[in-house]
Amino acid sequence: MGIIGMPGSTGSNSRDVSPADPVGDLDRAEEKYRRAIEADPDDADALGDYANFLADYRGDLDRAEEMYRRAIEADPDDSGGLGDYANFLADYRGDHDRAEEVYRRAIEADPGNSVNLGNYASFLADDRGDLDRAEEMFERAIAVDPDDAANLTSYATLLNDRGDFDRAEEMYHRAVDADPGNAIVLGNYAVFLMTIRGARSRIKKLFDRAIAADPDSAAILSGYANFLANICHDHDEAEEMYRRAVAADPDDGDVLSDYADFLTDTRKDHIRAEEMHRRAVDADPDNTTILGGYANFLTDVLGDHDRAEEMYQRAVEADPDDAVVLSNYADFLADAREDFDRAEEMHRRAVEADPDDDYVLGNYADFLVSARGDRRRAKEVRRRAKEARRRDKEARRQAKAALKRR
């Protein structure tokens, strides 16, 4: 649900300070955890902190889970430990049923833990797609702690996704007021303003503040580069920001993919663009958007249909309900393979995945005319696409009007 740097879970209940990244620091940190547990094998706090360390810094998920379980056995009613274990199950194991069970236990143990309430809300939105319950949990979390900038920002993102732009901006304002130097909050607010194509000067000020707060955030630098390239059309400064973003985190797949798009669309440098696409896929091999973007590049720019189809198939396997990827794959099947039956199957799946996406509906209507000669069905689908565009345009008009009133 996040935009810039917002993980699916808003935070950890960990009591300990995270170690620095160098290996020596990690080794010293691990030794400290081990000594604490040797001194008291039933110290739930130490066990939980060690579990977080093993998952986040060592990637040793089996040992991490063992420590989470020991921590919960030592203190079954510790809401912080339960919440961290739920985050682990959702984010690392992908075990959503067990994660939800543990989130509920954590909230029963302490209904006033705003971190757990916010994490559960993000889980409900991102992993369950239950936006109504997610909104209810965010409301509870913010009632408990009205100044939690992470929860306010995550809730703003949910409201933006639901098209409630006025309330979304209210939450972003509150998040910035609560934590004026938080680069993630500032960057997310800037991206929110950018998506509705308004308040250019405010967007730049927010990005400037975000970068001043965290000059090495790859996601924020890339977000600013997107703004400079797509809205300001300042391509030289945009490329400088993309390069800084890649230097800040050479393994951020989203950043690499955005830079690849810039190199393709603006610089027409297809050799470097493909290098960035490949690096993006290597960095995040199950990211549907990255795979789909590389597939589009392979077929539209290089004309390499075999590799393009491989990427489309991987993208659909990674997320079978991504409507845009399904729609693009359908276009590929019709145009490059002339496999109209499979193309129509993909178009239908795309429309089922998002019945109100005017891009998806428009592509399907074009297919019905060009491949099926079915103008009657195409007309109905175009009507739906037009209605979807009208609703979206009206929502954005209202959002821009609200911005001008502020």
Identify the function of each model-found stretch:
Residues 17-21, 45-56, 80-91, 115-126, ...:
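Conserved alpha-helical positions within TPR/SEL1-like repeat arrays
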Residues 365-369, 373-393:
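TPR/TPR-like (Sel1-like) alpha-helical repeat modules
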